[in-house]
């Protein structure tokens, strides 16, 4: 089977002056643009890591915070991705907005966020999501979905009399500090726009 491509050419050309206010401001704008365009989970990003035996691995996670220090996501610290990051604390992420013909690629060193940062985010999660984090031993095998739902029922009963569900001991956030950020915008004839930010240097790349 052969696949074609869709070229987007309906928006102004991406240029270096779009980054006058920094890469964070432009990334926020593009996430907002995706949300306004009806993209499901506009803050979804593909996280790429390296397994302890040196193999690539990727999965989709949600960007939950974005500022000049980098981007933050949250997960189970006993998950496969956490094992990867313990072995190689460096990662890459890609925000793919196919409907808009845009993507942003970012990579850099990864570190765990503070307990306070985790607590602040945890307090904003719906109770059901909090209970789900307690119920799931992420990346571990389980016999059936029924068994998973039974684990959820058990933790729901456990915290039934608790006004507040505490943060699980093995759960928290990671911060990816951006070494390199690249903005990509599809154009006709495959002459796509690429702008790379490395520290204070902003430069256009050939497609």
Curated annotation (Swiss-Prot):
The keyword Membrane does not apply. Pathway: Cofactor metabolism; pyridoxal 5'-phosphate salvage; pyridoxal 5'-phosphate from pyridoxamine 5'-phosphate: step 1/1; Cofactor metabolism; pyridoxal 5'-phosphate salvage; pyridoxal 5'-phosphate from pyridoxine 5'-phosphate: step 1/1. It comes from the Bacteria. Binds 1 FMN per subunit. GO terms for biological process: pyridoxine biosynthetic process. Its cofactor is FMN. GO terms for molecular function: FMN binding; pyridoxamine phosphate oxidase activity. The keyword Flavoprotein applies. Belongs to the pyridoxamine 5'-phosphate oxidase family. Catalyzes the oxidation of either pyridoxine 5'-phosphate (PNP) or pyridoxamine 5'-phosphate (PMP) into pyridoxal 5'-phosphate (PLP). NCBIfam families: pdxH, PRK05679.1. This is Pyridoxine/pyridoxamine 5'-phosphate oxidase. It comes from Mycobacterium avium (strain 104).
């Amino acid at each position: 089977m052969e696949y074609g491509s869709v070229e987007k050419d309906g928006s102004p050309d991406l240029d270096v002056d779009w980054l006058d206010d920094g890469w964070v401001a432009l990334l926020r704008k593009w996430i907002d643009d995706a949300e306004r365009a009806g993209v499901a989970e506009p803050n979804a990003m593909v996280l790429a890591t390296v397994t302890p035996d040196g193999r690539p691995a990727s999965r989709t996670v949600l960007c939950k915070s974005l500022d000049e220090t980098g981007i933050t996501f949250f997960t189970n610290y006993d998950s496969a991705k956490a094992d990867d990051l313990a072995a190689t604390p460096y990662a890459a992420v890609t925000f793919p907005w196919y409907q808009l013909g845009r993507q942003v690629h970012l990579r850099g060193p990864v570190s765990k966020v503070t307990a306070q940062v985790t607590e602040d985010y945890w307090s904003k999660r719906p109770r059901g999501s909090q209970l789900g984090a307690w119920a799931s031993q992420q990346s571990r095998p389980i016999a059936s979905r029924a068994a998973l739902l039974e684990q959820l029922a058990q933790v729901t009963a456990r915290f039934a009399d608790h006004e507040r569900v505490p943060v699980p001991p093995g759960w928290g956030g990671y911060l990816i500090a951006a070494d390199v950020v690249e903005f990509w915008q599809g154009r006709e004839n495959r002459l796509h726009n690429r702008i790379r930010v490395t520290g204070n240097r902003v430069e256009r790349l050939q497609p």
